[in-house]
Amino acid sequence: MLVPLVFEARGAKSVVVVGDFNKWDETAAPMRRFGPDGPWTITVRAKPGRHVYAFLVDGSTFVADPRAPRARDLDYGREASVLMVTAP
């Protein structure tokens, strides 16, 4: 399934989506920003089910998605969010 994600991070030089759907790979899913102060966006591929993810800002700070529920079981010890993907 393709899932769009949007993140506001004004002043950030880079934002990457990391999560169990990409094995927390810090290079697999760089986001694009539209305009100098626009939101960062990406569409990720994730199988149906529950996924845990976060945004990696400027290569050093993990931030949970403020638009999604927080994860309770943090396998990686980071603040993270939950993404539920349902089959069509």
Tell where the protein language model's regions lie, with residue ranges:
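Aromatic-rich carbohydrate-binding modules that target alpha-glucans
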Residues: 2-50, 59-86
